[in-house]
Amino acid sequence: MLAPRWRKVLGDLWSNKLRTALVVLSIAIGVFAIGMVAGGREILLRDLNGDWNAVNPASASVAADNIDDELVQTIRRMPGIADAQATSSVSLRAQTPAGDWKDLQLTVIRDLEDLRMYVPTPLTGPWPPERRTVTLERSAVPFLGASEGSQLLVELRDGEQYTLIVGGTVYNNGAGFPTALSQISYGYISDETAELLGVPPGFNSIDFLVSENRLDEDHIRVIANQVEGKIEKSGRISGGINILKPGVYPADDFVQAFTLLLGIISFFALLLSAFLVVNTIGALLNQQIRQIGVMKSIGARNRDIVQLYLVTVLAFGALSLLVAIPLGVLGAWGLASFFVALFNFNIATVVPSPSVLAQQIAAGLLIPLLAALVPIFSGTRVTVREALGGHGLGKGRFGRSRIDRMLERVHFLSRPMLLSLRNTFRRKGRLALTLTTLTLAGLIFMAVISQRASLKTTISEIFNQINTDVFINLSKPYRTNVLDQVAAVPGVTDVEYWSSYSGRALAADDSESSAGYGISSVPADGDSLHVLMDEGRWLLPEDEGAAVITSAYTTDYPDTKVGDSVRLKVNGKELELMVVGISRAPFPLAALYVNLPTFSRQMGDAGRATEIKLITDVRDSATQDRVAAQAEQLLKAQGVEVAVTRTLTVTEAQSNIGIDMVILFLLLMAVLLAAVGGLGLMGTMSINVLERTREIGVMRAIGAGNGAIQRIVIAEGLLIGLISWALGAVLAFPVSYLMNKGLEGVFQAEDSFTFVFSLLGVAMWLAIVLVLATVASFLPAWNASRVTVRDVLAYE
């Protein structure tokens, strides 16, 4: 049989079920958030990186044309190389059942035994792929609307079309940039099918593994430069080195930064629940002050009573764990599943590790326990005389502080409203904790809405610089007089030609940078692009040897300024350009802009272009789609090989995918904080009503009706909500700015985002907090209206 002290603990939990439910739910939300983020992060880092390393990713790759087996064998014998393989891929388009054309990149399997890196796992159908069949990477199946055994119409860049059979599926986390983000699907074909499609017999890329220090990126760069040098000595032109972060999935930095941000917010949710524990335990001690006196009078020591209430807090925490741990597992699965759709990996298990469980248990038991120590120790120090001689409700009187004296001067409100106003400030410690809870919830919500506005504004500013409706990239340079016919497409008001190159920066000792820099050769007086300048000026038509650099270049060379010279190696040619302007943006379209006529002459491409920019008369998606289709059809009729066709609307929508994902989860965390804030307010109002039982009875005795009492309680809740909104609105500005800086790291931006403080978010939170305060105050107000004079006489 339980000892009396433990029966008292159970009685306290059971006698006030609303109080118990509020505290348990509040703690559970914080523990759930911890479990969701910690568990989801564990799944992501374990399974995403595990699947990535399982395909045996290369240390680096070097692109070049006409690679043969002899060159591959030469590279395999180089010092520092553990293994190497050559790959061949072709980019084309595939038609979906709806008639849309989507990008498809096919890797040619020439020798299955020689496939050493980025090795796919067969799922269905024959492997390697048979003649006239295509084996799709699994993420391509829903993207293309394909199924095993179905026909897939593909179109090459020269306009030739072929029908292939979907022979099966494979899984390869290393096939390429995720389909959901890149809008490019991946597949595999045999050597015979490649020959049918006209794919050249050689290879166009070399992947290799270093033999030592495989996680040392600097070491990999040294070996990669040696491999590139070997390729160039063979007479081939390097298409650039690609080095990914060793040992982890390419998007690991994004995942780490994003989950860290979610983790910080989940900690706030737990912190807010701790405030409710402080309020609840403080109120419980105040209500049971006579019980404490009786226990002390019959021999209970301070430590016995402290132990009693600590066990009560532990019971709150234990009950919250029963709710939060299963929900945390579901939340972790949901968070990881969202990333599965983006990054294409397998979830091995959702069972939380001992580390995650330990974090949740510590959050559910230790944090509330620590939060309750102060009210428990201070509340149990009361003497027997003080406990039995007081009423337990005498504290919290109004009229002693400066704030109280200021409120006494308010006379223009009705008496019930004055009572609500003064009641709000009776328990200032409790009010402070409740305001802290709601204020934190509000400022996080307003900060998230501001981040959405900042990100959308940043993306909008980027696209406002682009006065182009249709982008057409060609597979090789073409003379512009062959391309001029696209101007005849109905709806086209202007046509501009660009060329794109990739170059390496040259140091004073003539060593090349490991990173390549995109160079856009544009008409200086064109209208398709309006770059915002931070320093210097934009290009002039008469400029020769001039360049405008962007954040993509200055991030690596921050000391570069207007008037400096930059040396580049482009397609084997060494060039020296003078910086005439600098444009800083978080997501620059290129590292350098140069003048098309003069630069193309330097490169031997005078009168040629690799890109076409079309400007339409009506800037809507329907017009853009029609013009893109007609222009592409016209070019193919002229024998022009089109690599990619994009419209502005589609490009902008794709750019918002990652932003919308981040904002969605930040809003989810903000909602959790708001829920904790609402529970905290409901708990505070319930405690206030309980402590004012006698006052409510007096009001009943002098004729106060149910509606009047309910209005007093709800008005008090609304006032607390309004004060928290005002405090949150003031603090939200600096928090929004700091969060803006944090998101720059999440998205690995080259420069600062445009910061926007959203007044819409402030207005939205005002509406939400008023509704939240009304709902949170309704049940306590309803309970208050049910108090009778008989209840008051029986109240202890």
Annotate each language-model stretch with its function.
Residues R601, A609-I615, V627-Q630, L634-N740, ...:
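C-terminal transmembrane helical bundles of large multi-pass transporters
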Residues L2-F268, A283, N302-R303, I462-N464, ...:
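Membrane transport/envelope proteins' first extracytoplasmic loop
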